[in-house]
């Protein structure tokens, strides 16, 4: 049962990372940032479309591990139509629970990298 549960969680992370619907930058917005995890070398670039103080769209490109890719994908979907001042609530939501699980504690910096890049872009 433990092995099965572990595989399911890993499959969830794989599924998140493989969703690349918001992958690819447009280079049309002033809300842009790149960020690097100095511990592991993961890199991300993010671009935000913001209108009326709401994030309408997030685009990203990564050179990173699966945890950072999954986090970027998940964040890019959940940030849409979020007021800029409410972005902090997304990363602590239940949606990120699978990525912030204590058994992946050593990957927390990887998971947080897209969020940090978004904050930097603002």
Residue ranges and their predicted role:
Residues 27, 31, 59-60, 104, ...:
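Sequence-level detector for tyrosine residue identity
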Residues 54, 59-111:
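Active-site- and interface-proximal helix/loop "cap" or "latch" segments in soluble metabolic
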